[in-house]
Amino acid sequence: MERNNILPLVLLVARPAAGKSEIIEYLANRIEDSVRSKDYHIGQINVIDDFPFLWRWFEEDDLLERMGKDRLFTDQNGYFKDTAYWDLLIQLINLEYDKSLKDSDIESGYTTILEFSRGKQHGGYRRAFSLLSDAILENLAIMYVDVPWEESLRKNRERFNPQHPESILEHSLPDEKME
């Protein structure tokens, strides 16, 4: 497949625990490069996922609390103190994408996959999409993974590994955050 047939940027959209990270894992590590490019128009993969940013905030807040300081981002129940932090996560995705464009390793033949999930209570996808940079929107393809809520909830409960709650593939949300 010619490099110009490779999608430069794909946003993977779905509910939490709908399989977004598993799709990325499959595309990146389970099939040959030639199959991925020919069948899916996906090149070498660069992933920008907001979960590592989010998890880092939880860790930083826990550390601050242990130091006797106020938590910055989240309350003790894991909810953001300010809904603006959902917007900040999108701005961090924009920033990481801009930085990746400067990376000489990320060139034609690469596909950047953006991954995040949003609920209605803080603006949903409409709000998140409105904050994506022009650099992203100019090249964006969107792949929606349609998974029933019940299946997403089941997978969310099953995938949790208490030994690795920071894991992209093994973290979960409390049921009330899934609604």
Name each model feature, range by range.
Residues 1-179:
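Glycine-rich phosphate-binding loop of ATP-dependent small-molecule kinases
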